[in-house]
Amino acid sequence: MKQQLSVILNLSLVSGFVILGVSVISPVLPQYALSFSIPVALVGWAVSAFALARVVMDIPAGFVADRFGRKKNMMFGLVLIVLSSIAAGTASNYAWLIFARIIGGIGSALYMTSAATWIAQISAGPSRGRYMSLYSGLVFAGTAFGPTIGGYTAAHFGLRAPFFAYAVFCLAGLIATLPLKEPMDSSRALGSRMSMKDVLSVLSNGPFMLVNTAVLASFFLATGVRATLVPLYASLNLGLPEEKIGILLTVAAVGTAISTFPSGWLSDKVGRKIPMMACLFLTGIASLLIPSQESVAGLMGIMAFYGLAMGLHGSIAAWPADMAPEGKLGTSMGVYRVMGDIGMVLGPITVTYVADYAGNSTVTFTPFLVPAVIVFAVGLLMIKAKDPAARRHAEEFMAE
């Protein structure tokens, strides 16, 4: 038990370092992209290039892990992130920035897919929601401190500095990964080696894919609103500097970190569906409220509300893990990562195109409306979703 917890903590902390690095650049990435004299519509690609690479690599990352082992997969991924962060920080044009972001996304896919699968493997059972929300909570803790660090670094050392900070954090994560030992029972826990037949089998599993639409919608809103529209709105509409934008994003991330673990505990008691539906509806409401805020205090209050609401999906990875077809956990977690990353790709691109189409020099209400409508619609779809954790809890209650 202690060894299991130590592995989960290690994977969670290193994942937190990786996400800390991602969030360090979040307050400055839209403005950094604009510094290359591009239209607002192309800003979304600078944010989404990272996730687009992850979409392409999430499932192949599972094949690579089967061939070389999860630990080697994770370490190589961290090396790629370090190198790509340095490349982004030294970019001389927009194309080079996009290239660096793509390489970083490949590295992230190699690391995060293996880490999520490893944790899902060793946390099977009635406590899965709590263990996976511990992982999510530490990951979100990384997002809590990153924006403030990034905003401060950019304000004092320039827009390029956060990318070098990103490299340092991932280098620390690489060092922390060295003591981990590859699990000896991975093939038994995950089933046979991943194959395209397995991938197609998982993709054709209707109940599993329905649950993953909630994953896609949640990440669509998170990257479209928090990572893209909020920095642009704060900068273009309210004229806030990078430091204050970083604080706004930190407030949201702290709220998420606070509510994530209680949400995981709750999901083990009442099932995954109720917390996830609450997350979708409440974050949609928050998205609609953001563009009505004309003061820093008001926007900060809405971001705190948004963060607490987003944390309700603390067991977001546990639900797909519960629904994974027998013997296909590794493949299922790869598909789960793909669905989340598709949301991460589409969110920024969609909202910035909508914002650019409006033709204003500021961010209007319409770009915030689009992700809100999507999460509301998907939230209603979840009424039909299966929830094994809720069924298990009901059976245990009846047995008592």
Q: What spans do the regions from the language model cover?
A:
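Paired small-residue
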Residues: 84, 95-103, 286, 297-305
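Helix-breaking motifs and short loop linkers at transmembrane-helix boundaries and internal kinks
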Residues: 69, 90-96, 239, 271, ...
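Short amphipathic helix-loop junctions that connect adjacent transmembrane helices
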Residues: 28-40, 228-243
